[in-house]
Amino acid sequence: MRKYRFTFLFIVLVQLIGYTQEKDIEIELLKKLDSISRSNSIARHFASLYFETTVLSINFFANADPAVKNFIERLENNFAGFFFRSADANFNKTGIPVVWQSYFRDSTLSPLQYKLLGINAHINGDIWQALTSEFSAEELMKNRMTYLRFQKGLQKQYQRFYDEYVSSNLKTGLVNNTTLGLSRIYGKIMLSRWRKRQLRLAILYHTDKIKFEDALSNLNRKREELNRLILRNL
């Protein structure tokens, strides 16, 4: 897996150098994720998965029109900042954002638990914040289909991730075998629902603060319930 990651880093960096200086942002993003993934920090577990997903996103939108690429690049850069700041807070022993506290609280979890906790924190805790701090309601509604378009790419990444951890983890393997593979399908559906919910939440943030607060409270409760399931059952 590490060789796979370095190979893609080399390919992507070479491709990006040939484009405009705006691509420097993506180069720096990949370099920082790769650096964290090679560190001794427990942040490395999610960073390695995040690196692969970012490469996938860059390649997925490589031939998109400038407006689409601009939206995705702005989102990627702002979104990643939430993970980086949480990792830095853990390293510096300062206050870790609430959505990442379950991830960094225990240094003895399995790589699978860290990756699942990271996915839960980043998707169910960070996306709406990245969307609202970077885009207006009008921009979000205008770029709704661009945001949702990447779901196809994420499903490929989920498939790869699922195949890897099911083959190496007895409990998740048993779950898959006893449900005839439905847990694989269910995971893809939930990933899509989570991302759509984050977009709706971001639009509510700009348009209806009362409904937003109710939806956010419900989301926070579900996120913490999922964290407990990950910690207790895997």
Residue ranges and their predicted role:
Residues 24-28, 182-234:
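A cross-kingdom marker for long, charged
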Residues 37-86:
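N-terminal interaction modules that seed assembly of large macromolecular complexes
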Residues 33-37, 57-65, 86, 90, ...:
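Secondary-structure edge/capping motif, primarily at the C-terminal ends of alpha-helices
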Residues 69-70, 108, 139-188, 195:
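Extended, low-complexity, amphipathic alpha-helical coiled-coil/linker regions that act as scaffolds
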Residues 98-161:
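Active-site-proximal alpha-helical scaffolds that flank and shape metal-associated catalytic sites
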Residues 1-22:
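Bacterial Sec-dependent N-terminal signal peptides
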Residues 24-37, 56-59, 99-105:
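Short, charged/polar, low-complexity loop and linker segments
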Residues 69-77, 86-95, 107, 115:
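N-terminal amphipathic/basic membrane-interacting segments and domains
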